[in-house]
Amino acid sequence: MANIKEIARLANVSVSTVSRVLNHHPYVSEEKRKLVHQVMKELDYTPNRTAIDLIRGKTHTVGVILPYSDHPCFDKIVNGITKAAFQHEYATTLLPTNYNPDIEIKYLELLRTKKIDGLIITSRANHWDSILAYQEYGPVIACEDTGDIDVPCAFNDRKTAYAESFRYLKSRGHENIAFTCVREADRSPSTADKAAAYKAVCGRLEDRHMLSGCNDMNDGELAAEHFYMSGRVPTAIYANSDEVAAGIHLFAKKNNWDVEIIGEGNTSISRVLGFPSLDLNLEQLGIAAFSLFLQDEPADIKIQHKFKKKA
């Protein structure tokens, strides 16, 4: 198999010149660069990208930690990241955790071992105390408001956004309002923000007002059944995604249940079924997160939400 010494011999240049060509070094004459490429083509030589990455100290790959690889919320963030990464000739590696803290730490180790150049965390399983040390090895970017914690972030003002959704339901005369979420408030910053918004707008939050474990349409149907069979049936439900809202809508239709529904995501589902939906502009959030990865100075970027009312 050909190596750079053989390429150097056949091209009548030094090994260091071949190395510079492989690493796109500017200080090589165009004549020598063309000659080296011609010999590489004749020998059908393919550079060892891993070795070159080690020499450069860069892989041009960014890791994206996300809980699930098939969830519309995270799909939008990933779409934004990959679009921005492509424009800057970076590859993205998706790192699903299913909210397993140990798996998340294994992915953080990829940064320490230089397998990736940086990490964008769309949603985390570990406390920041377990994550901060890895900033020594490369950029770590969050897709949530990190507050006083020294981690660059692209974020929504979720409390304000969620409060707007609850206020909309209150303005429509609803007093018994419930909501769904993925994880409990003590494990999820997003749910904690939603719970805080609920209390600010609706008053006391009781266990009967919320249900976790909701990810898709099937979960939405089960959530609707849960609320429908409860002692005090809610007149309005704020679902954590349009898919979950669609499941609630389906159950309500089957059971002639007059319940108002709000979704999240502003997808074609909410437009077809005709319920309001909160749009957190997650693709733009992903684009902003990647821009922070490229920056030398840490910064925070706030992404504005939109509340799409029923037409």
From Swiss-Prot:
All residue ranges annotated as the HTH lacI-type domain in the record: 1-56
Quaternary structure, from the entry: Seems to be complexed to phosphorylated HPr.
Function as written in the Swiss-Prot or TrEMBL entry: Transcriptional regulator involved in catabolite repression of several operons.
UniProt keyword annotations, A-Z: DNA-binding, Repressor, Transcription, Transcription regulation
DNA-binding region: 4-23
InterPro entries hit by this protein: HTH_LacI, Lambda_DNA-bd_dom_sf, Peripla_BP/Lac1_sug-bd_dom, Peripla_BP_I
Gene Ontology MF terms: DNA-binding transcription factor activity; transcription cis-regulatory region binding
Presence of the UniProt keyword Magnesium in the record: no
PANTHER family: CATABOLITE CONTROL PROTEIN B, LACI-RELATED TRANSCRIPTIONAL REPRESSOR
GO BP term, pick one: regulation of DNA-templated transcription
Chain's gene name: ccpB
Protein name: Catabolite control protein B
